[in-house]
Amino acid sequence: MYKEPFQPTYEYALECDKHDELKDFQSEFYKKEGTIYLDGNSLGLLSKRAEKSLLTLLDSWKEFGIDGWTEGEHPWFFLSEKLGELTAPLIGSLPEETIVTSSTTANIHQVIATFYEPKGIRTKILADELTFPSDIYALQSQIRLKGLDPDEHLVRVKSRDGRTLSEDDIIHAMTDDIALILLPSVLYRSGQILDMKRLTAEAHKRGIHIGFDLCHSIGSIPHHFKEWDVDFAVWCNYKYLNAGPGGVAGLYVNNKHFNRLPGLSGWFSSRKDKQFDMEHSLTAADHAGAYQIGTPHVLSTAPLIGSLEIFKEAGIEKLREKSLHITRYMLDLIEHELKGFEFTIGNPLEDEKRGGHIYLEHAEAARICKALKANGVIPDFRAPNGVRLAPVALYNTYEEVWNYVQILKKIMKNEEYKNFENKREVVA
């Protein structure tokens, strides 16, 4: 990384790019000419290696037919476990604790069905009011399946400022009636990183199992689950991990829980050598593979093979180093160039509390996003008034960040956003 103090000049951006140790990975990705893509926290870009691995698995279907389950470069029968092994270094887990399977919401249903056991006074699930809505939908559903009322048995920690959560408030809410905790690792709006190590330790002091939704952190920040002793986690792979739209998700279960039967069992929960014995009594796998349910979505999984190879080469620590540097650069530029335009920084400024994206707040956010798109910049809008921007370490440049800020300054100065309605599109 370039170590010289921040300067708001174009030349400074070019120097940062010149000293970027990850710059060689930029050519791995398909980037549309004339476009600045800053939405990798919502959907990552396609890499050439991800494209190649998808085509390789299509070819294995073409060449081997049903024998593709055990033949070819990437036999389908073992693909979920292989990708779990490649994912493990990104979350600091053991390979056998990690599996690529299903979708984030389905995996939430799996871990809640497995770990939520309301007994006596311990009947409630602890979450928060800022988490992604689908997590809440799944928790409410699982509570109803236990014959309980979500309004009474789902506790949501309140935010003090509408942007972030206080870990002290979360710990204070870990009362004797809490049976299970599910929290985001990084908040999807503000990008705040929760202290997973501290929260896990505090939950375990009280005899509570705790897990995390990593959708906005995996591939962006390091995790150390073995050290922290986290009980379970779920995530998607299509954001920072660039697995493509509908890419298969991931699941982690601490190996100390491998004696626990999955709450939702299915065809691929089986031990591999027993699966085709066709017995009606399940012999569950003795690793995270037990928490699979149905047949792997092979073609939706395929791009992740190539993508995870890139992450293995780049290293999550190096990616985090650049992410912190380039997001700090974006914040400094915004502060220097956009004063007087009524923007508010909605994300934490401290490095240890900031994830991989920047969250700008403005009363005209929806139509500012539309104006940015009309000028070739791809951000995303989050209600009620947020513009999310992710300069991704693998493929975004400092020059792009500099150009983006100049474009936004022009939009605000010329009031170009007034040409658009201030409401979100169907897909924001």
Curated annotation (Swiss-Prot):
It comes from the Bacteria. Its cofactor is pyridoxal 5'-phosphate. GO terms for cellular component: cytoplasm. The modification N6-(pyridoxal phosphate)lysine is found at K239. Pathway: Amino-acid degradation; L-kynurenine degradation; L-alanine and anthranilate from L-kynurenine: step 1/1; Cofactor biosynthesis; NAD(+) biosynthesis; quinolinate from L-kynurenine: step 2/3. It is an enzyme of class 3 (hydrolase). Homodimer. GO terms for molecular function: kynureninase activity; pyridoxal phosphate binding. Belongs to the kynureninase family. It comes from Bacillus mycoides (strain KBAB4). Its EC number is 3.7.1.3. It catalyses: L-kynurenine + H2O = anthranilate + L-alanine + H(+); 3-hydroxy-L-kynurenine + H2O = 3-hydroxyanthranilate + L-alanine + H(+). Disulfide bonds: none annotated. Pfam families: KYNU_C. NCBIfam families: kynureninase (TIGR01814). PANTHER family: KYNURENINASE (PTHR14084:SF0). One of its GO terms (biological process) is NAD biosynthetic process. Pyridoxal 5'-phosphate binds at T104, T105, F132, P133, S134, D135, D213, H216, Y238, W267, T295. InterPro entries: Kynureninase, PyrdxlP-dep_Trfase, PyrdxlP-dep_Trfase_major, PyrdxlP-dep_Trfase_small. Keywords: Hydrolase, Pyridine nucleotide biosynthesis, Pyridoxal phosphate. Catalyzes the cleavage of L-kynurenine (L-Kyn) and L-3-hydroxykynurenine (L-3OHKyn) into anthranilic acid (AA) and 3-hydroxyanthranilic acid (3-OHAA), respectively. This is Kynureninase.
